[in-house]
């Protein structure tokens, strides 16, 4: 205390204004203690609100969200989950402002485990729904179906998540490989880019029905398609007509789809009878 007062008097005699002297003394009384270091950042004499700004910036650069396990779209190879890292800013700020002099404080993160982990994928082996339709039409139509099935293949839908066909498949354009093929427009059949992918959405719809998952959005064609009974179809058109379903089960499901011989097949894998072990 005497040293601080003496320092204040010395600064005054050197012509330093009283407001600056007061601020200097106030920081030494109420700021972080001398010699306190957070990682490699000197923190001495900072006020708590200043410490918080520094800690938040450090935490922001080091924080990483957890990443669920997933599947490689083409091969189905497992992509392992990644743990995240979270920082309790309030706790770190408290550690800094209450630290004794000459303390070295480490920015300790808290590991965050994702909800859906690598080991869970091994349990999603039950066949919940399986449906196929006959493959018909021109090479362009077949290619459009192949591309759309490749887009939805190996998609994991978490509990409570909504699967959107349009969102997963994306816009059907020439640049993305889609070709001109017949599409149903009103009461007419006309050429259009991406013609045929409604067979993919229809086959998916029926697999979802068999899996007893909740249908969120579906429309049927105005003209019955040749590959399925009218009323069991699900038309899609970018971006306004979509097919959506929700995974209202307790565990994730995997959507799989591919052309097998002269059949378009979509099947749903999951876990029957409850939560993960």
Positions of predicted regions on the chain:
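Surface-exposed, secretory/extracytoplasmic low-complexity segments enriched in Ser/Thr/Asn/Gly/Pro
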Residues: 1-277
């Amino acid at each position: 205390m005497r040293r601080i007062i003496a320092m204040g008097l010395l600064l005054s005699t050197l012509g330093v204004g009283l407001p600056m002297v007061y601020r200097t003394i106030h920081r030494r009384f109420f700021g972080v203690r001398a010699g306190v270091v957070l990682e490699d950042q000197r923190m001495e004499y900072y006020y708590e609100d200043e410490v918080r700004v520094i800690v938040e910036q450090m935490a922001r650069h080091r924080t990483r969200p957890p990443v669920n396990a997933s599947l490689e779209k083409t091969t189905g190879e497992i992509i392992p989950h990644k743990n995240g890292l979270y920082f309790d800013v309030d706790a770190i700020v408290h550690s800094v402002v209450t630290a004794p002099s000459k303390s070295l404080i480490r920015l300790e993160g808290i590991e965050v485990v994702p909800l859906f982990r690598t080991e869970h994928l091994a349990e999603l082996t039950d066949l919940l729904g399986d449906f196929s339709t006959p493959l018909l039409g021109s090479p362009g139509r077949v290619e459009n179906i192949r591309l759309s099935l490749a887009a939805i293949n190996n998609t994991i839908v978490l509990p409570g998540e909504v699967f959107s066909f349009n969102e997963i498949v994306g816009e059907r354009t020439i640049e993305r490989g889609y070709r001109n093929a017949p599409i149903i427009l009103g009461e007419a059949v006309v050429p259009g880019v991406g013609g045929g992918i409604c067979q993919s959405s229809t086959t998916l719809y029926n697999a979802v029905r068999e899996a007893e998952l909740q249908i969120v959005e579906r429309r049927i064609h105005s003209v019955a398609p040749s590959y399925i009974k009218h009323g069991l179809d699900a038309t899609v058109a970018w971006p306004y007509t979509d097919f959506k379903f929700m995974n209202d089960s307790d565990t994730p499901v995997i959507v799989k789809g591919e052309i097998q011989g002269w059949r378009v097949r979509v099947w749903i894998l999951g876990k029957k009878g409850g939560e993960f072990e």
